[in-house]
Regions:
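Structural preference for solvent-exposed beta-strand-turn elements
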Residues: 1-150
Length: 150
């Protein structure tokens, strides 16, 4: 929703065991889809960041669509679960997404106390960051890299 990308995800997995594989595989598939959709990345903004405030929580995200898949996440979530969702899976999603989208992603909680708010703000920050980084900028001629490829 916050990235304004026109997509719907329907994921089915072995959730009777746990949601780890389903969440990670969803990150992998979305990452691959972004990598494919961006093609040679000509004309994209490439770099972006966003900060999302949600009550007591503040989370920032920054991205470089660099061709190098890596994520750095500092999301200390105070509880192990939000409902039935294992909170550490949020970070696993971001790692898988960044690796397979071939981008560098930083997600950091600057303030927070409510686990639900922290995770929701993180996903919203990443969505807005991806929207901005993927946007075509008419001022960018060709691929936004001195190397000529990303």
């Amino acid at each position: 929703r916050h990235g304004l990308f026109d997509l719907t995800v329907h994921a089915v997995g072995d959730v009777e065991v746990d949601a780890h594989h389903t969440v990670e595989d969803t990150g992998i598939v979305l990452g691959e889809a972004f990598c494919h959709a961006l093609g040679d990345k000509a004309g994209i903004t490439r770099f972006a960041d966003a900060a999302i405030a949600m009550d007591e929580t503040l989370v920032t995200a920054a991205v470089d669509i660099s061709g190098r898949g890596q994520a750095y996440c500092e999301l200390p979530v105070p509880t192990e679960r939000v409902g039935s969702f294992d909170t550490e899976l949020a970070v696993e999603f971001f790692y898988a997404f960044a690796r397979d989208a071939k981008l560098t992603l930083h997600v950091r909680e600057l303030a927070g106390g409510n686990s639900h708010h922290i995770i929701e703000a993180a996903f919203k920050a990443v969505g807005r960051t991806m929207r901005r980084a993927c946007e075509l900028d008419p001022r960018v001629q060709g691929i936004p890299s001195t190397k000529g490829s990303l």
